[in-house]
Amino acid sequence: MADLKGRFDDAKDKVEGTAKEAQGKVTDDKGKELEGKAQSTFADVKDKARDAGDDLKEGAEKLTDKVKEGFEDLKDKFSKDK
């Protein structure tokens, strides 16, 4: 649930940043334009980091499953040898 809230917050920040950037362009306010661009870019970075974390977690879960399968195979092999 926290991840979903984080993704929502990132999307909201991206939209707000894009709006500030557009406002800065329309009003020729370079500060507002850069602020918006920075906010939008930071939201993208957070979203990509969240994706990378999800990928790492998924990879770790797959590795754990493979290790468990390996232990089960070894256990079965030693049980048959007795």
UniProtKB/Swiss-Prot annotation:
Alphabetized Pfam families for the sequence: CsbD
Coiled coil stretches, renumbered: none
Bias (Basic and acidic residues): 1-36
InterPro entries in the cross-refs: CsbD, YjbJ_sf
Region entry Disordered, spans: 1-39
Family: Belongs to the UPF0337 (CsbD) family.
Entry protein name: UPF0337 protein EF_1180
Organism: Enterococcus faecalis (strain ATCC 700802 / V583)
